[in-house]
């Protein structure tokens, strides 16, 4: 499918949420699949609610996710002159008009119609006024508006259900409904993939496309994401913004895999690489029902990607805000092989690996140290006699068995007496493996520090 151009067009009124991230991913994958372009447009015409902080969060969120856009970012607010130009063109063509009706009057009529169970269809009743007018697009009477959606099929409503559409506010700023049509046309957008909550907007925008003789893009409206309880996603369901997931310790590749599977499927495949996603992605495999968040599935995916990442790459991520000596980095590089299998989050992995950096005795470890102090001292003395060249798993295991026989101490008590002072926690990988990684000097130092 040549010449595909998709876009992601968020409003910078908040952080990049998970629904927006999925929309961006689907548009990016569709463009990648067809050798097309993926553009980024910031829809910042709502001056009161748009913030630079939100713009930065959107850009940073896409960067973290690994979703790259083509060309320069388009800021909708910088195209207002173009929006006004096209609005005036519609007025000249008789497809739009200046409306002087006070906003509060229109709002009251809408409320009254709703209370009466009617559809309010605005017609301007004020030819002139001291107030600055809005520009309204004339919605034709009694016409079927048909959207040929790539997910829902043909969806039809009557134009009688629509009010005349405000396209320019009284301050000459464009409304979302209108600006999007102009911007998408000028950018050559061929395919619009967005949330199903935009379907009502599409009926209105289709009329504007037709009035301007613009080529109509293909539309695909993706069902929304719901919480695990089946209700519309909200903050009470937990993390909703991309930055929340990054802080939790989710890997971007795991997040991409997870977002892809929220509403799209490829047979029974769960673990899907970027290469496979680009090769397989299509609109036909997007379901019509809302996708549900499943944090257990996200944990499973994240554990998979953590487990399969190289120790060097994991260490780089773990140490972004920490400086360690080469010796401690060496401990971590060796220890991560076992630890990463246990972690569902990077933050969790950092906690699991903490004992390689420093020892903080847990309450349980403190109690064991207190109860086994004499055994710990004996072990420190006994292990000091082991040569550094013999400090390996097989030799240490045999020596500890000898120690058990010599002092008539259970092996389980010996392992506890080693684990508590050396790691500070009682739920860690095999203590002999840890001792080999730390080396003789560090182990003796930790045993003697008690």
Curated annotation (Swiss-Prot):
Gene3D superfamilies: 1.10.10.350, HUPs (3.40.50.620). A motif ('HIGH' region) lies at residues 10-20. GO terms for molecular function: ATP binding; glutamate-tRNA ligase activity; tRNA binding; zinc ion binding. It is an enzyme of class 6 (ligase). It is found in: Cytoplasm. A motif ('KMSKS' region) lies at residues 232-236. InterPro entries: aa-tRNA-synth_I_cd-bd, aa-tRNA-synth_I_codon-bd_sub2, aa-tRNA-synth_I_CS, aa_tRNA-synth_I_cd-bd_sf, Glu-tRNA-ligase_bac/mito, Glu/Gln-tRNA-synth, Glu/Gln-tRNA-synth_Ib_cat-dom, GluQ/Sye. Its main location: cytoplasm. It catalyses: tRNA(Glu) + L-glutamate + ATP = L-glutamyl-tRNA(Glu) + AMP + diphosphate. This is Glutamate--tRNA ligase 2. It comes from Wolbachia pipientis subsp. Culex pipiens (strain wPip).
């Amino acid at each position: 499918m040549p010449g595909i151009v998709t876009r992601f067009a968020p409003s910078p009124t908040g952080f990049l949420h998970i629904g927006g991230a999925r929309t961006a991913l689907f548009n990016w994958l569709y463009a990648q699949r067809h050798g097309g372009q993926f553009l980024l447009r910031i829809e910042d015409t709502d001056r009161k609610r748009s913030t630079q902080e939100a713009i930065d969060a959107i850009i940073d969120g896409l960067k973290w996710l690994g979703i790259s856009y083509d060309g320069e970012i388009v800021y909708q607010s910088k195209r207002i002159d173009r929006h006004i130009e096209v609005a005036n063109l519609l007025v000249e063509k008789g497809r739009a008009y200046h409306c002087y009706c006070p906003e509060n009057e229109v709002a009251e009529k809408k409320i009254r119609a709703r209370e009466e169970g009617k559809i309010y269809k605005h017609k301007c009743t004020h030819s002139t006024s001291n107030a600055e007018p809005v520009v309204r697009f004339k919605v034709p009477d009694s016409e079927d508006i048909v959207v040929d959606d790539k997910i829902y099929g043909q969806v039809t409503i009557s134009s009688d259900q629509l009010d005349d559409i405000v396209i320019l506010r009284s301050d000459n700023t464009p409304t979302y409904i209108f600006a999007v049509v102009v911007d998408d046309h000028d950018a050559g957008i061929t395919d619009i993939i967005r949330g199903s909550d935009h379907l009502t907007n599409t009926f209105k925008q289709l009329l504007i496309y037709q009035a301007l003789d613009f080529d109509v893009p293909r539309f695909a409206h993706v069902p929304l994401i719901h919480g695990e309880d089946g209700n519309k996603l909200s903050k009470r369901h937990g993390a909703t913004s991309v930055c929340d997931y990054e802080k939790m310790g989710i890997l971007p590749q795991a997040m991409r895999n997870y977002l892809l599977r929220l509403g799209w499927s490829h047979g029974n495949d769960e673990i899907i690489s970027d290469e496979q996603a680009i090769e397989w992605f299509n609109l036909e495999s997007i379901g019509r029902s809302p996708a549900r968040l499943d944090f257990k599935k996200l944990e499973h995916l994240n554990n998979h990607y953590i487990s399969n990442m190289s120790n060097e790459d994991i260490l780089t991520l773990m140490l972004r805000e920490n400086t360690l000596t080469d010796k401690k980095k060496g401990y971590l590089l060796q220890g991560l092989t076992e630890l990463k299998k246990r972690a569902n989050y990077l933050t969790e992995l950092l906690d699991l690996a903490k004992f390689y950096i420093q020892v903080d005795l847990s309450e349980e470890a403190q109690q064991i140290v207190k109860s086994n102090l004499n055994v710990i001292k004996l072990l420190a003395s006994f292990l000091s006699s082991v040569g550094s060249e013999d400090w390996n798993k097989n030799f240490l295991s045999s020596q500890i068995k000898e120690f058990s026989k010599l002092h008539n101490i259970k092996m389980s008590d010996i392992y506890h007496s080693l684990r508590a002072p050396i790691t500070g926690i009682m739920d860690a990988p095999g203590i002999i493996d840890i001792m080999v990684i730390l080396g003789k000097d560090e182990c003796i130092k930790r045993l003697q520090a008690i």
